[in-house]
Structure formats: C-alpha cells, structure tokens
Regions:
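Canonical Rossmann dinucleotide-binding motif of NAD(H)/NADP(H)-dependent dehydrogenases/reductases
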Residues: 205-235
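Substrate-binding pocket helix/loop in short-chain dehydrogenase/reductase
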Residues: 313-315, 319-324, 444
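A short, exposed helix-loop element centered on a Lys and neighboring polar residues
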Residues: 338-339, 384
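Alpha-helical segment proximal to the catalytic Tyr-Lys
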Residues: 343, 388-392, 472
Length: 491
C-alpha cells in the first residue's frame, strides 16, 4: 500500500493553502502547554515543515500515529504513541480545536493508564506522567514536549525518525507498531527506572521560560545570566536586537547549544535566544510573544528591566515630546508588556511572575530628573494595580534600584561626566569611561547607609529572589536595592 503522505494531493485528508494552518498558532500552543503541564511544566519544540504537514494532513496519519513507534530508544521519549488531534483545520475554528485537544487529552490519559494497568508487572515502577510528549495537529504540525529544550528537540527528532520508518514500511508493505507488552517492558525497564532515580535534582527554575525585556545590557543582561544558572530558558529582548542577541550568544557559549536536531525556524533553538522589540508598540510586543510561543511553547516569567532617563534641557525644562518618550517606555511600555503577557498566561492557565524595574527616585523628590522620577512613581503604583488585576494567576512585583552606573545604558559617558561635574568630583576627560564610571559609582555608594556600590548583579539577585519559591507568597511589592537610601524608604 502506498504511503499516503507521499501521494499529494490524493493522499491528503485535508487541503490548506500552503499546507499550513490558516489561523495563528499563538492561541493554541500556550493552551496545549497548560493542558499537558498539569503535573509538571514542559518546554516545547514546534515542527511545521512540509514533511510533517504531509503526515498530519494525510488520510493514514491518524491510524499510523495510533500504532505508535517501533524503536525502543524512541518511545522512551515519545511514549507509546502521540496524541493525534481529530480536527478539520479548514474550518479555522480555534474553539473547536481547543475542545478537540482537551477531549483528546482526556482519552489519551485514560488510554495510557489502561496500557499501564494491562502491562504492569508486580515489580513495575509507579506509572509516570500520563500526558503525551508528542502532539500532532492537522494543519499545524507537531509540538513535542520535554523538561527542557534539548529534551523536546530530541523527542521531536525521534518522532521524525518514526515517520520515516512508517514511510518506508508503507512504501513496501504495511507498518506495524511494537507489541505493547514488549514496549512496556522497555519503557518501565528497572534499569531505566534506576537511571531516572539517579538523576540530579532539578534546579529551582528548571522547566521555565523567562522573557527579559532590556536584556541587552546592565540589569537585564545580568538577570539573564542569573536565571539561566538556575535552570531557566531565557528570551533576551531589547530595542537593540544586536545587543539582545549578544547576550543570548554569551549564554549559549557558556552552556552549549543543546542536543536534538528538530524544530522549524526559531523553534530549533537552545536555552537562550535574542530578539528585538519596541515595548511601546503593542504590535511589536504581540509579535514578540508569538515568536516566544513558537520557540519554547509558553512563558513562566516576564521581567522588564528596560527604562530610559532623559535629562532636562539647559534651561532645566523637559519638552513635551521627551516627557511622552520617558513615560512611554517607563510606564506605558511596561504596561503593554505585562498586558500582552497576561493574555498568554490566561491561555496557559499556569501561574507565573511579572517583575518590573522601578527606582528609588520614585519616592525621592529632587531637581534635574522630573520626567524620570514621576514616571517611576507611576511605575510603582502600576505594580500594585497589576498585582490586584492579575491575581491569583500572576504575582507582580518590582525591584527599585538606585544609581546602578556599571553596565547601564542610562549612564553613557556624557551623563557620567555631567554627573561628576555636578557633584564636583575630580576627573580628567582623558580617563577611560570605566574609570569615570567607577568614580561616580563610588560617590553614590558613600551616600548610602551600606556604603557599597550598587551593581547589576545585586538587582539580578533580588529579581531571582522574587521569582523563587522563597517569596512565593509575595505580590504587589517593591523591593529597594539601593544600598540603603533613607530618603527612598517606602512608607
């Protein structure tokens, strides 16, 4: 019998323009992640190339998928079979698709439990997570799931191999899956279970996907490195896309590209990617999250460290356009990012975190930074309002730095020199920027109660604390990380 996925168009069960889903994947992927992550969170890999679409769109696709894979090494990742969603993509009806996915998952879990009960032996390990690791959807392709990006890519790679085995078998005769008892004895092999039990404990942020806005420099860059160290996958985002990519490249260079040869486009990525985004443009932010869904399948935390300081002109006046620019980034931009992220979290139905960056200036009134200070005061209250609006699904908190000069794009050389001049600190304009920055940082340190410079790493540590279980019951709170500025004490 000919393999129907190779006989286009005669072998197609559905016919879609260009073979791909004619509705956006963004509403579907996070929904699936939430459904399969009821026990433990998963990271996804999406494959929607021509080969995969021919399979999921074919007449024989559902039946072949039901037979499962035939290689023991494969179904340790892919499980005994994938979930094939019974849906007509020509309709483009998202709600019908969601219902089909939910119903399919209920049946899949029942089938897996029945398979376990039917095949288990007296000494078999306890049943593992009954959720599928491979989901096949006509018109959309395949979404593979794993505890991290490498595992989901390997799972996707293995199912690609399974499709090739099916194609070859169907081309010459008929494909047959492995006997279920034999498959079970391999999947629940005591030595395999022993290997799983010897695995090191998961890190605190394992299985999580964090989006960091402002990751091109300073606090954002430091935070990206900090959360990856704890197991998170990181989407490094910046208005300067090259800077965002540079941060992601640093992470990949340190931790490696991962394993597994699968995933279409951006989904064939490692533990970090770098993307550009204008946080004041809702379309740009929505596009960012759509890309994140394709890359990793969902989000668990969104951290905004991007901000802007615009000094007044020589007369001490802030022009209207510069006022709008400051509030556009420090307040409106933070709100747009949080609002678009909230939409994703509601689709996932998984709890998560949003962390903003405000400032000690939010509560300290002074001359020379009118637009910045008032925008940060607004950002402080934005945190509280969002915490109320987005509870109980999300915790919303912030860190409030003060005078983080090192690595900050808000302290370019000219501003550092202006500040040194303002405070009558001796310097020579021939000095390197790093030396000038250190002088200013040390000056600011002397004004604090702890007498220590405040660096990006200090903010990153506070952000990690808010992300962690240690402050898992804290929301609507701003943590000052300013060395102790008594004028900045929150009241």
């Amino acid at each position: 019998m000919a393999y129907t996925t190779c006989t286009v168009p005669a072998g197609e069960k559905v016919s879609i323009s260009a073979g791909k889903l004619n509705v956006p994947a963004n509403p579907i992927i996070p929904f699936i992640r939430g459904q399969v992550s009821v026990n433990r969170r998963f990271v996804g890999t999406v494959q929607d190339d021509g080969k995969m679409l021919r399979f999921v769109n074919s007449v024989d696709g559902p039946g072949l998928a039901e037979l499962g894979t035939s290689c023991p090494d494969h179904f340790l990742r892919t499980k005994i079979k994938p979930l094939f969603v019974n849906w007509d993509p020509a309709s483009g009806d998202i709600e019908t698709l969601k219902t089909a996915i939910a119903d399919g998952l209920v049946q899949y879990r029942e089938d897996y439990a029945a398979y376990y009960d039917r095949c288990k032996r007296p000494d078999s390990p306890a049943m593992r997570d009954p959720n599928p690791t491979v989901v096949l959807i006509p018109g959309l392709g395949m979404i593979a799931w794993g505890k991290n990006k490498s595992e989901s890519r390997v799972t996707a790679e293995f199912y690609n191999c399974a499709i090739e085995v099916m194609r070859g078998a169907q081309a010459i005769d008929k494909y047959e899956g492995m006997d279920q008892q034999e498959a079970f004895d391999i999947e629940y092999w005591p030595l395999e279970e022993a290997k799983l039990q010897r695995m090191p404990p998961e890190k605190e942020l394992d299985r999580q996907i964090h989006v960091i806005i402002g990751a091109g420099a300073g606090i954002g860059k430091e935070t990206a490195h900090r959360v990856v160290k704890e197991g998170a996958h990181v989407v490094c985002v910046d208005k300067d896309e090259a800077a965002a990519r540079a941060t992601a490249d640093e992470i990949i260079a340190k931790y490696g590209p991962g394993i597994g040869v699968a995933g279409t486009g951006v989904s064939n990525c490692g533990v970090a990617i770098g993307l550009g985004c204008d946080m004041t443009d809702r379309q740009s932010v929505a596009k960012l999250f759509e890309t994140v869904m394709l890359a990793y399948g969902g989000i668990d935390a969104v951290i905004v460290t991007a901000g802007v300081f615009v000094p007044p002109d020589k007369s001490g006046h802030v022009e209207d356009k510069m006022w709008d620019f400051t509030f556009g980034i420090n307040v409106k931009g933070a709100y747009i990012v949080a609002d678009e992220a909230h939409k994703i979290f509601k689709k996932q139905r998984l709890t998560g975190n949003i962390i903003l960056t405000t400032s000690a200036n939010a509560v300290v009134a002074k001359k020379g930074s009118l637009a910045y200070d008032t925008s940060k005061a607004a950002a402080n209250h934005l945190v509280r309002e969002l915490a109320i609006e987005m509870a109980p699904l999300l915790r919303v908190n912030a860190v409030a730095p003060a005078t983080v000069v090192k690595g900050s794009t808000m302290f370019p050389r000219d501003r550092v020199i202006a500040s040194l001049t303002k405070y009558d600190i001796a310097f020579d304009e021939s000095e390197e920027t790093d030396a000038l920055t250190e002088k200013l940082s040390n000056f600011y340190a002397k004004r604090s109660l702890t007498q220590t410079p405040i660096e990006p790493a200090d903010q990153a540590e506070a952000i990690f604390l808010l992300l962690s279980k240690r402050l898992g019951k804290t929301t609507g709170h701003i943590i000052p990380v300013d060395g102790g500025l008594q004028d900045g004490f929150l009241r």
